[in-house]
Amino acid sequence: MPPPPEDEAIAHKGHFYGVYLLCSQSLDSRYRAKCYVGFTVNPKRRIKQHNRGCDFGGAKKTSKKGPWQMVMIVHGFPNNISALQFEWAWQQPTLSTRLKIFPDLKRKKPKETHFDYNFRILNRMLSVGPWHRLALTIRWLETDYERAFDLPIPCHMEIVSGKVSISASQRKLEEATGTAPPVAWAHECHLCMQSIEQPERSRLGCTNPTCRLTCHMLCLASYLLGDEPGQYIPIGGECLLCETRLSWSALLQRKRLQLGVPEEMQDNEEEDLSDDGPDVDSDVEVQEFSD
């Protein structure tokens, strides 16, 4: 497989969950500029399936209504369930209990395009829980559609441009994201000063490879939560040794990769990335988590 272009991000196979927005480029005025929201673990393969039709793994709602462009994708979800919850709410903003505080989402505004309406829904979603605490990446895939959000998004989220490639290579991922483990570990937790039992599973450190920060997972989580009463999952914070900015989701992602534990592959993801195996979007009802 040829290496990805230099401006293309690399995500690890089995750990990527994305919710994307398609826009139709159909010459038929009935379908042109219509939008579709879906879930994928492999963006490149998914857009090919949509454009080939439902007989090749595409969705019924997009079949024969293209060609389609995948104009943006939101990723960084901790698991497929979280991503599917997000997809469902984006598809059904009037049914989502979390979006009822935004009555303006009930319908498209006059002269508002389908893309603008879906972008407005996304903007509101990123400002409410549980999504506003996730370290999500909003990735523009087509520069013609790029625009600024009306409501500011949380500062721990990223807005980037460029394609994303799925790789099974641990070396490629470490080179692209700097997820290599620290040069050395301490024997005791820097926070509670107790020894760490089963370090392979319960130990976390800094993302700076030259930093020797060594902590119990729960100790570091409590430290990063700081003065956030009522919260159980941290967003991030500064390393207590080197002051590197830490992302909790990035720390957990690195731990999974070090353990070699793949996440569940949604919709029977095939081993061969070139294979057109099923990658079906969730047309079935997905229930929201209760508060």
From Swiss-Prot:
InterPro entries named in the record: GIY-YIG_endonuc (IPR000305), GIY-YIG_endonuc_sf (IPR035901), Slx1 (IPR027520), SLX1_C (IPR048749), SLX1_endonuclease (IPR050381), Znf_RING/FYVE/PHD (IPR013083)
Primary site of residence: nucleus
Record keyword Zinc-finger present: yes
Renumbered residue ranges of the record's region Disordered: 261-291
The entry's keywords: DNA damage, DNA recombination, DNA repair, Endonuclease, Hydrolase, Metal-binding, Nuclease, Nucleus, Zinc, Zinc-finger
Span of domain GIY-YIG: 15-101
Zinc finger extent (SLX1-type): 189-242
Gene Ontology molecular function: 5'-flap endonuclease activity; crossover junction DNA endonuclease activity; zinc ion binding
Listed EC numbers: 3.1.-.-
GO biological process, one term: double-strand break repair via homologous recombination
Annotated PROSITE patterns: GIY_YIG
GO cellular component, one term: Slx1-Slx4 complex
Acidic residues bias locations: 264-291
Cofactor needs: a divalent metal cation
Enzyme kind, highest EC tier: hydrolase
Subcellular location, record wording: Nucleus
Domain of life the protein comes from: Eukaryota
Function (record text): Catalytic subunit of a heterodimeric structure-specific endonuclease that resolves DNA secondary structures generated during DNA repair and recombination. Has endonuclease activity towards branched DNA substrates, introducing single-strand cuts in duplex DNA close to junctions with ss-DNA.
Family, as annotated: Belongs to the SLX1 family.
Subunit-level organization: Forms a heterodimer with mus312/SLX4.
Protein name, entry field: Structure-specific endonuclease subunit SLX1 homolog
Gene source species: Drosophila pseudoobscura pseudoobscura (Fruit fly)
Lineage: Eukaryota, Metazoa, Ecdysozoa, Arthropoda, Hexapoda
